[in-house]
């Protein structure tokens, strides 16, 4: 899980979702997981 100031989609399978007021990127590729910190 990468913690980044600005999260963005890396590939077309990446999905931006909002969970508990945080912006997350979930993807089939585990390397693409990101959270806004």
Curated annotation (Swiss-Prot):
Superkingdom, natural source: Eukaryota
Listed GO biological process terms: translation
Molecular-function GO terms, alphabetical: structural constituent of ribosome
Pfam families xrefs: Ribosomal_L36
Annotated localization: Plastid, Chloroplast
Key words of the record: Chloroplast, Plastid, Ribonucleoprotein, Ribosomal protein
Keyword RNA-binding appears in the UniProt entry: no
GO cellular component, one term: ribonucleoprotein complex
HAMAP family: Ribosomal_bL36
Name this protein carries in UniProt: Large ribosomal subunit protein bL36c
Organism from which the protein derives: Pisum sativum
């Amino acid at each position: 899980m990468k913690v980044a100031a600005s999260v963005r989609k890396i590939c077309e399978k990446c999905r931006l979702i909002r969970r508990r007021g945080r912006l997350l990127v979930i993807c089939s590729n585990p390397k693409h997981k990101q959270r806004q910190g």
